[in-house]
Amino acid sequence: MKELELKYGCNPNQKPARVFVDEGDLPITVLNGRPGYINLLDALNGWQLVKELKEATGLPAATSFKHVSPAGAAIGKPLSDTLKQIYFTDGVELSPLACAYARARGADRMSSFGDFISLSDECDEATALLIKKEVSDGVIAPAFSNKALEILKAKKNGNYCVIQIDPAYVPPATEVKQVFGVKFEQGHNFIKIDESCLSNIVTKNKNLSEDEKHNLIIALITLKYTQSNSVCYVKDGQAIGIGAGQQSRVHCTRLAGQKADNWWLRQSPKVLGLQFVDGIKRADRDNAIDVYIGEEYEDVLAEGSWQRIFKVKPEVFTREEKKEWLAKNTDVALGSDAFFPFGDNIERAHKSGVTVIAQPGGSVRDDQVIETADKYNMVMCFNGIRLFHH
């Protein structure tokens, strides 16, 4: 098939809409549902991300996309008991691929609501059962087991979007887009992210473990398919905070850092001990936790409000308690899609437990940035690779 007609483009008034190729066939087959324009942008970007994560790490990978940027991305490492609890997988048998999706979805559950999922490997039953329970628009994978396909086809009253992609497909060397009637042409970004990108360590501390290398590679590959400007915090094989599409680099670092902080706060005893009313939906629980750990916590603790959410009124999670818990988060990796212009980015990263950094370098203030990293005994690599994506 050379062409797929779509219901509409980015918005309902943008008709007609289609995706097509000039030569050969489309690399995708729609097995169920009817994907939208943005769904396919998410699917094709997400597929490239997980394919490269699998190639770089050797482990199954998954990503959760919203509006053409990942909300989460991860490889299939086993989950701790705490992560199983906050990812709603307690008592569930998980395959490596299911672990990858649980991590990708669980990093920023608020942003992943209604996501489009990309999987590096054949979707198995365990992964399909996880997807079944989440609010999601669709999934793309190189294959689906019969049982997984049966489960997914029943989702959303039979309208859940399921796309199979040819894993052997290689895009043309040149890509073209059109804006306001003007065509833009550039070479496809085939740059490979691997350990060679981490060889130029510019800080005094040059000790980079294999796990830290993996985390930095995950950060950089994630950034390659994130709308710029972007930075990505990674811990234990998964993105824990992605700051996308900000005009200011330090605002990326703050946004992603706050997301990483929220991920860590969700694992605190105070949050794990919250007693929710029976029958509360996952989305309502996620929203309540997000408010509870934030500055507007009074909104869920107010009289008449907390009773709809909690069995017992929670104690305030004080600023001092949160600061004490956040100080326990360490061994976080940070990647940036372009250079850090000032040391303030490093200062903010330090607050979220960052110990290793990969960035292109090239700022006129590189010396100041390196000095700030040295102050915290961080390891920082200059890879000379800009990863802008639009």
Locate the predicted segments by residue.
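Active-site loops and adjacent core secondary-structure elements that bind or stabilize anionic groups
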Residues: 1-197, 212-230
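Conserved helix-loop functional segments at active or binding sites
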Residues: 52, 225, 262-266, 351
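Flexible, glycine/charged-enriched surface loops at secondary-structure junctions
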Residues: 56-64, 163-165, 228-235, 265-276, ...
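Active-site-proximal loop/turn and secondary-structure-junction residues that shape catalytic pockets
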Residues: 69, 123, 235-238, 246, ...
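C-terminal binding/interaction regions
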Residues: 115, 119-120, 133-163, 168-170, ...
